[in-house]
Amino acid sequence: MLDQFLSDLKQLLPNDRIYTDELRTLGWGTDASFYRQIPKVVIRSDGEEEISKIIQLCQKHKMPLTFRAAGTSLSGQSCTDSVLIVAGKHWEKYEIGKNQDTIKLQPGIVGARVNEILKPYGRVFPPDPASIGSAMVGGIVINNASGMNCGVHANSDRMMVSARIILTDGTILDTSNEESRRAFRQSHPEFLEKIEALRDKVRANEKLASRIRTKYSIKNVTGLNLRPLVAYDDPFDIIAHSMVGSEGTLAFLSEVTMKTLHDYKYKASAMVYFLTMKESCEAVVAMKKMKAGEDDLTYSAENLVVKSAEMLDYMSLASVDDPVYLQYKKDVDAGKIPDVKPGDYKGLTAILTETKGITHEQLLEKIAKIQDCLSQFKLYIPAEFTEDPAVYGKYWAIRSGIFPSVGGTRPIGTSCLIEDVAFPIESLPEATVKLQKLIADHGYNDACIYGHAFEGNYHFILNQSFADEHEVARYAEMMRDVAKLVVEGYDGSLKAEHGTGRNMAPFVQYEWGDEAYEAMKELKAIFDPDNLLNRGVIFNYDPDCFIKDLKPLPVLDYDFASVPDGGHYLMEPEHSTAKETIEQVKRANKCIECGFCEVNCMSCGLTLSSRMRIAVQREILYLEKTGQNPERAATLRKQYKYYGDQTCAADGLCSTSCPMKINTGELTHLIRQLDMNKNPMGYKVGEFAANHMAGIKSGLRVVLDVAHVAHVTLGPTLMTTVCRTMNKMGMPLWTTAMPKKKRQPKKSDLTQFIIEKSIPHHEGQHSDLKVVYFPSCINQTMGLSKEAPFKHALVDEVIQLMAKAGYEVIFPEGMERMCCGQIWESKGMLDIADRKSAELEAALWKASEQGKYPVLCGQSPCLHRMKKVMKKMKLYEPAEFIMTYLKDRLDFHPTDKPIAIHITCSTRQMGVDKDMIALAKLCSNNVLIPEGVGCCGFAGDRGFTFPELNRYGLRKLKPQIEKNKIEVGYSNSRTCEIGLEANTGIPYLNIVHLVNISTTAKK
């Protein structure tokens, strides 16, 4: 059956979008849940027609199939052991409605990106899950994911306008299009009749209809969404809204149109501390009753004074070292808190409260009402609202930091589980206390409870081991007791936000009752009569399915002792590259495979993502350590070489969106180092290069000169053809963007510039303003490309700019022999990297007169490396240096000509991207910061050896360049600029060139 399915599938799709190998099925089969199933086939789909035909093939061969977008769901709804269809990064189209009150979205666009699109219009995307920075629209809608503000009034179900879906027979239905509806009426009359019959049946049962309305008055995503059956008359509206919360069990969502809401201009927050959890919940109930004016409904779907109230229990506060909690502990131990014994801190509970106003006056009125409401409760300290984003931003950072903080402190090898329940708001004070006690009674003493108290919705985090049957049984018993408390005690929701998945599938009927469950089964049968869509999710008749297929999290335990340490070469050995790399890899054991990293992993979608690399490495090490299945271990290790190692840009941007700040690039560096330990010849080549840098630079200049002559002689077309053929044979790829050689700077350069520009200068006069300039070995070797619009290479431009601003340039001694060490670090020779860094450090220390003068490096990746190991000097790349030292010494004359800038990954990591943008805007009134372009993927030399990585990283750039009619771009890394030019067809240069042509000396 599988072989025939694959045979038919390969007639439909190219092989490079069908994965059946051990490595990619394992990688793509990994999601954020604590379940693991490995798909037999992973399919990367690019369009509706493809999806339609794939679904028909699955029907033909009776192959169960699961759809997936970002894979950030938590309940096991995006994993399968059959066919996995990925609709992610190629499904990102959108269309804003005429009045900006709606937006049409494909499923692969990230939620936070939607808010970026809407921001200029003062609108927001209503659903706001905590994963919005990584979760995609398809998953947000199909799981009915919500968060801190949207509640039940602005979730996907309430905000959906229409949907475009693909049914199990391959039919494409657009519920917003009358022609599509008409065609569907003709082709699927029985389908519509069954929907209408189920609607009427449910409504005729007043008890059931009433129960459905009551259940959805609080957050509830347990089971299929029954609300459409009582909320909408039109069968097409019922079909569309049934998709919300269906978790891929009914159809494929290819497009959705959602309402947008106004974003309030005025906001204020307060962290309110209560002495008991019960009283904090009573305050929430009281605040929930406070109504705002009707004008609020023009901005929000609900007119309440308080817009959100997030509860944080004492363990949550402890996990983030909340300063008020720390003071409370001192007061308790000092006997200052009445009726509380020393050492008993569990009473303190915080409610993070937010209110918003259309006008500032309205905001102040709301704050006064909230303060009046809080006055009836006993607080630990007085509540203080702040309108300062910098202050309340810290409050929300505390709230957002709970999950990573708890997850980051869990014992290695355990899973971090986030459970998700909701109670009716009036039951909150009593139910919350009981939930806290229940969790403690089962031995989860480090668990914390936090969440959306305003919606009666709590998350509790458990550090859970699945290493033995006893631990699994403990978890199962606890979950059954939670179910009993929620369902029998308060008729609440066993899943409020995170989806039913496999985790809560055995409890759906228990929560809803027989009649509602039968209605869900009927709805499922109408859409998916053969039960092929996401089998085992929502509907699962194995009562123990929630404790099966549990994901192992084996320890990443490498031979760290074999990593050579070159830290002793450095002025400060504690900044050793080996030590930092090992620490980062050990931190990777905290990875919970949530997938938040993937939005910033540029190889995600081409080969593997950061999350997948960790998951695969865990499997390899586990198999090798246990001796289980050595053939599979060997296969995974072999396949990992290209997909995991060679196509990892190792840029570290994954850490910027990782809750645990894990840098998977360092894992790649370690793997390369361990591989290099087994390659004596490779190490000898590295040693030779380190000891003969001057000769190698000279040799490279000769190579560049020969390549330039060949380019001129053969022409770009023939030269490109020849070089692409050689690249397929393993040679680095030459492109038309390749630079000419760069000659070394001479003293006469400055003199010649002064003569040309008629700048007053007296021989022998030295400026008090000095800068040590290390161009980097790249900029010492590589000049401009053939098509560059300037005649001076970067080194000359820097000298000229410094003279214009009155700065004297100091070059470090022996510069031709110097390198920052980045090349060796990226190749996995960490000790040599530190040795080269130390040589440069000593030269810069001397040239800067022991740190007296700032140091400028012309290459941002090199500076990033230098900053990691050289802490005693002030180090800058061009943009930050110019904004810090030169801006006030120059007159800027901005051009109206459009330009593009590329923010390199190292620029982002150093936090100087804002300087790059600000500087560009001083020089041009028309600056393009391309959307959807992060790391370019050139990654040192990867753009030469694996050009597909560079092409993929920049796949969204050229259309934007052409649309905006841009003729030149700027950055701050020569190697990145080569790749940018090769993939856009326009020259890219260092931003120093732009500053030079846009400025004159200050008058």
Where are these regions (language model features)?
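N-terminal flexible segment immediately upstream of the FAD-binding catalytic core
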Residues: 1-56, 70-101, 249, 253-267, ...
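N-terminal glycine-rich flavin-associated loop
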Residues: 9, 33-65, 83-129, 145-197, ...
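Flexible, glycine/charged-enriched surface loops at secondary-structure junctions
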Residues: 16-22, 68, 125-129, 203-223, ...
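A glycine-rich phosphate-binding loop feature that marks nucleotide/adenosyl-phosphate handling sites
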Residues: 26, 73-76, 131-138, 222-225, ...
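Mobile "lid/hinge" segments at catalytic clefts and subdomain interfaces of large enzymes
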Residues: 137-232, 236-319, 345-352, 607-628, ...
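Terminal amphipathic helices with adjacent charged low-complexity linkers/tails
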Residues: 256, 261-263, 294-412, 447, ...
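Ferredoxin-type iron-sulfur electron-transfer modules and their immediate structural context
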Residues: 414, 488-494, 500-647, 659, ...
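Iron-sulfur cluster-binding electron-transfer modules in prokaryotic oxidoreductases
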Residues: 528, 535, 665-1003
